[in-house]
């Protein structure tokens, strides 16, 4: 199966029930609370954390106190029970301050979403309360060194042995992998690719699981991205999520939430780049006047603002559709594609507007420029997104249903 087939596979998974829409006033209050938190606690320290590539332990503890690890988890299971519209607003604000924080939340949320959508009641009761509180952090483990967008190459195996599965293989690009207590794992079983939740203690080694490599990155600093090697690791059969052989469509459906997250964090980075450019253009003067009064700069600012607003609306549309329980592979792909390209373009334009200062580490725009490419590549490259979008559109055109 190629990633272009992913839309069809995800559509085979049972649709989640429509979420209860969060009251608009509550949504605004939550997002404003996060905005103030970012301005007070994140923005002042982000440059140092970025430079040192240091995990933001104190900020993560404060995020736990705010309930940000349980935004979409139902209140009955200890979460805030908020909708995806609220979630993307939270992610945008975190990305505005420091994009790395959104990675800490995103893979955790995707792991929790897999359990919410496809886990049994017993599994939900067992895992989600500690995830909602942030006591246990989650990770998602789909990609492998030789299997990224081409999911047919997944080689990690889980072999049934009585009441357990024995897992062997290597997973790549695992965000939160070392610090996670729960890992949503895609592994090949006799029936096909199946989804499991692996329980582990945070750390580099645990009962046949080893962090075999820490990946150095251009941006996205402070959060670990690792390879994880499984050697005869035993997973209880009770940790199988849903039916054996149905893991791929389940996880690909969850990746729609991941792509909406990528889009919202791209909006946050793009907004930060735009605000930096707008502010600097009014402060910096050339030829006797602020550069904001030069027509060339005004044209750039107009285009930047327009793309930013379009990216935000595409992301909101995808979130609303997902929350309504509708298929949104096309909409999530469009949002991810456009918003990530917008973040890349706006970070470059912001650097150009800053001139030489934009190339220095004294200004935050160089960080936006380093962070933006992750959104173009992550959760399926933009080339793959275009294929998913096109296939989805053609499928809808052939259908008498949604067009």
What spans do the regions from the language model cover?
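A short, Trp-centered hydrophobic/proline-enriched beta-strand micro-motif
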Residues: 134-142
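Short Gly/Pro-enriched turn/cap motifs at secondary-structure boundaries
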Residues: 104-105, 131, 146-149, 173-176, ...
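N-terminal glycine-rich flavin-associated loop
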Residues: 103-122, 148
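A short core secondary-structure module
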Residues: 163-164, 168-210
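Long, acidic (Asp/Glu-rich), low-complexity accessory segments flanking structured domains
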Residues: 231-250
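Short glycine/proline-enriched turns and hinge-like loops at secondary-structure junctions
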Residues: 82, 150-152, 176-180, 221-223, ...
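Flexible, small-/acidic-enriched active-site or ligand-binding loops
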Residues: 153, 203-236
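Alpha-helical interface subdomain recognition
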Residues: 1-97, 101-102, 118-123, 130, ...
């Amino acid at each position: 199966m190629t990633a272009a087939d992913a839309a069809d596979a995800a559509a085979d998974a049972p649709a989640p029930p429509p979420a209860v829409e969060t009251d608009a006033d509550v949504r605004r209050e939550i997002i404003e609370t996060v905005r103030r938190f970012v301005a007070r606690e994140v923005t002042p320290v982000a440059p140092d954390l970025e430079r040192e590539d240091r995990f933001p332990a104190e900020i993560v503890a404060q995020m736990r106190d705010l309930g940000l690890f349980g935004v979409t988890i139902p209140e009955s299971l200890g979460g805030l029970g908020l909708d995806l519209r609220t979630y993307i607003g939270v992610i945008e604000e975190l990305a505005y301050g420091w994009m790395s924080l959104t990675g800490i939340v995103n893979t955790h949320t995707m792991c929790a979403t897999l359990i919410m959508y496809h886990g049994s009641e017993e599994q939900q009761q067992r895992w989600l309360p500690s995830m909602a509180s942030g006591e246990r952090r989650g990770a998602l483990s789909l990609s492998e060194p030789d299997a990224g967008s081409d999911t047919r190459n997944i080689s990690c195996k889980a072999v049934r042995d009585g009441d357990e599965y024995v897992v062997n293989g290597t997973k790549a690009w695992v965000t939160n992998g070392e610090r996670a207590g729960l890992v949503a794992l895609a592994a090949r079983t006799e029936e096909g690719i199946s989804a499991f939740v692996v329980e582990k203690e945070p750390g580099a080694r645990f009962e046949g699981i080893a962090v075999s490599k820490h990946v150095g990155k251009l941006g996205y600093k402070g959060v670990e991205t690792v390879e994880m090697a499984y050697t005869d690791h035993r997973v209880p059969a009770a940790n199988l999520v849903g039916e054996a052989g149905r893991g791929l469509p389940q996880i690909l459906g969850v990746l729609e939430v991941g792509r909406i997250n990528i889009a919202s964090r791209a909006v946050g980075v793009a907004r930060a780049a735009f605000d930096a450019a707008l502010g600097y253009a009014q402060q910096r003067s050339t030829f006797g006047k602020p550069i904001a009064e030069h027509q060339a700069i005004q044209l750039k600012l107009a285009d930047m603002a327009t793309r930013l607003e379009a990216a935000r609306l595409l992301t909101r549309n995808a979130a609303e559709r997902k929350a309504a329980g509708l298929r949104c592979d096309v909409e999530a792909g469009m949002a991810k594609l456009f918003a990530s390209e917008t973040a890349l373009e706006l970070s470059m334009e912001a650097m150009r507007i800053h001139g030489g200062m934009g190339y220095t580490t004294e200004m935050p725009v160089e960080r936006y420029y380093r962070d933006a490419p992750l959104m173009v590549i992550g959760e399926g490259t933009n080339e793959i997104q275009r294929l998913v979008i096109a296939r989805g559109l053609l499928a809808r055109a052939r259908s008498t249903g949604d067009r």
